[in-house]
Amino acid sequence: MRAGPIGSMGSLGTRGTLLGLLTATALLYLWDLGASGYADPLYSAAVQAGSESWPAFFFGSLDAGNAVTIGNAPVAVWIMAFSARIFGLSPWSMLVPQALMGVAAVGVLYATVRRVLDRGGRDRGRAHWAALGGAAVFAVTPVSVGAFRWNGPEALLVLLLAGYCTVRAVELGSRQWLVGTGVLIGFGFLTGLLPALTVLPAVIVAYVVGAPVGWRRALRDLLAAGAAVLISAGWYVAVVELVPARWRPFVGGSPDGSLLGLIGSPRATGGVVEGAAESWSGALVAWLLPAAVILTIFALGWTRSAIQRAGLVLFGGWLLVAGVAGQPAVLPPAIGGAVGLGVAILWSARGSLPARIGLSAAVGATAVWAVVLSSRTAGAYPVLGWVAGILGGLAALTLLVGDRLAKVSAVAVLVGAVLAGLAGPAAYSLVTAAIPRAGGGAVAGAVIGGNELDLALLDGASRYDWVAATVGARSAARLQLGAGYPVLAAGGLDGSDPTPTLAEFEEMVRQGRIHYFVTGSGDQVPDASGPALEIQTWVSANFPAQTIGGNTVHDLADAGQ
């Protein structure tokens, strides 16, 4: 095959194909979005609280009574709660901003990859198609679809970490753009805590190897960017820490009620993946992971362009650190970026045997991996995997010996490679979008007062700071979403947080601030420990139990206490 551009078209065609990708992405992320109801009840309750109380909004509290936070940084909740303030609380007002952030993130990744190739010299002819392909890989990775159709922090976090500012900083040797990168990472920290920092090592190395500045200037620029990270993340941490504990909610998931305590806890590393990626299942994220690694290695060995090298280091390093840290939710942009850059760089050099080996190995590994992943599931997936595997195998063989097969169409080879790489994740993504999912028994829809317990909680609700209390944040969130009034989560996130203490709870009851205590609701109330167990024991010993809608309920306003 003759080495040359993948294809070319005018600016109208370029804009049209990009618009087509973004439109298809929007349809994938928005289609029947309300079917999952309130999705994760924990974040939905925080959105509800933030739409009713500005202090709850600022702290990311679970309830408008401002008793306990959701155990994560609040910026993602701010966006959804602000939408709920404008349009009213509903699944659509909460989830549409998430989906739109996903579309924006796909567009930003396209711009990032295209800029690297446009500024990298001889690969300009294929920059659009490579960037489009990388963005498509990102868009149809199942974990991306799950994240952008969900109400967790993943959507905003991924948008903030898309890497465009880093590429501009490398291209221009610009401290301003690098500081902008730091600001985005800092706000990423305020979105998902430590997972936001997985991109930081890659940013540092990319700037050092690619920016047209000396090492002293690079060091000063990186220090300025580090200061930007600290300031953009630290201001909020400082405010929370400086506000006396009695004037703010207990920070859920922390051992001592402080945000610093949460940052130092195991939850700070794992909370992000809770909604969109429950596990490291390969079907969620890993379809093109082997290809991304292979293409990055071979492309780094071939390219002589500083900005291309920096782009590969950025996405490859991001991939490495996020993979080692076990953060699948932030991997798709890195996979898409690495695939887009690697294919463009090696395709331009496919007249060379090493470049053909790299392309062939990437396509072949993807084909084999598609068979392996699809064989783990039932239905038509194994058949689809074998079809993708066969097409990918043929494409890999053709790429390897392509210089001897002059009559073989480059377009046919690319089609086979694309089908091998995208058939599996696209199929999984369509299923992800088509099947409604709700986390932890979330309320499906904006139904207030929809069952017997909800109606009981509504009785005189306006007279109480909390219409009920129960053990654990998720059980409290479900009750709160059903009743439409604040519910106190005893024991914080999982029933083990030391809040409130028994003495504090007794005082709340004496002051008439809590109406009911729910001690049983099937398997939806977690086991209590610490102060929550003491509270539950005290309530059971002092207040008669009654059954309402299958739930064990104690009336704390009962005069017989």
Question: Which residues make up each language-model segment?
Answer:
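Structural motif corresponding to alpha-helix initiation and N-cap regions
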Residues: 450-451, 499-503
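Intrinsically disordered, low-complexity coil segments
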Residues: 117-130, 183, 402-409, 419, ...
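Membrane-integral, polyisoprenol-dependent glycosyltransferases
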Residues: 1-261, 265-358, 365-369, 431, ...
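Short periplasmic/luminal acceptor-recognition loop of GT-C membrane glycosyltransferases, typified by
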Residues: 423-495, 510-538, 543-557
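Transmembrane helical bundles and short interhelical boundary loops of multi-pass, membrane-embedded
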Residues: 350-448
